[in-house]
Amino acid sequence: MSGESFGHVETWPGERPPWPGRLWRYTVAVALLAWSAMSALAQTWPFPWPEDRIARYTARRTSSPLVIDGRLDEAAWRAAERSPRFADLIGGGPGIHDTRAAVLWDETYLYVGYWIEEPFVEATLTERDSPIYKNNDVELFIAGRDAYYEFEINAFGTIYEVFFIWEREFESSRYARRPEFDRSRTGVRPFNGVGFRQHPRGPRIGYWNWDLAGLDTAVHVDGTINDNKDRDRGWTAELRIPWRSLEPLAMPDSRALPPRDGDEWRMDFSRFNQYKEAPPAKDSGGWAWSPHGVWDSHIPELFTRVRFSTELVGQK
């Protein structure tokens, strides 16, 4: 396109220029409408993954407590609906190795299971609250209205936990009144996300000194860990979380613990690897049940919607 004025129209001698003003006004009006629509959309949904593509899941009840051994071989786990294969956290393409998760519950506990395909199972970190994300791991985030909990585990069964509170709600949601959330304690520091730093709710306060009371976990390796002379099938991880220990998440909106039939919680299920599928595959090294469109797990609005049903698992 040339650099001529948009309003210039060539005419024959004696003719009036045809509708340049109207054309300009029409074009400006269309542009303003388009800009307004895009602005409204951005204000309505300011997150990097479409709202209509967020995963949904129904968690059903188990009739008896589960033994936490990491094997996931009890009847309830065999009957539980598993997630789809985890997809790339950023792009949404399938991960090179299969990863799935499932959720069960009863009156006392929330149960989460992971099935992790890994041909060469590896782990190095053995000290609790080590940076497990530097190993191949699986992760769970559980969000309340004004806070969320992060959990990570590697193939050794070493765990990492953090509790995050949205700073704007620290006072209004009564966290400031609780000694366990004293901001002067060791291990407390500000946090503003990883790859998505424009979150509309702003920064969080992270409690790296916080442990979820009564948490029980186990892993089972189907192969030989840290021995690449053979090929492994992978590993499984199993979590049991007391409902009463999620009270800090439930506090701001007084949600029921255990949940009532039809209640919804937001949870994120992911896997992070120290390896990637070779190009041209677009493998970020992080896979999730519900992708985020950006390298950041800390976006509760993009967590899987988990609805709790009082229906017993396996009855449908």
What are these regions (language model features)?
Residues 43-316:
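Structural preference for beta-rich elements and adjacent junctions enriched in aromatics
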Residues 13-15, 31, 278:
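N-terminal compositionally biased or targeting/leader segments
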Residues 2-5:
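Serine residues within intrinsically disordered or low-complexity segments
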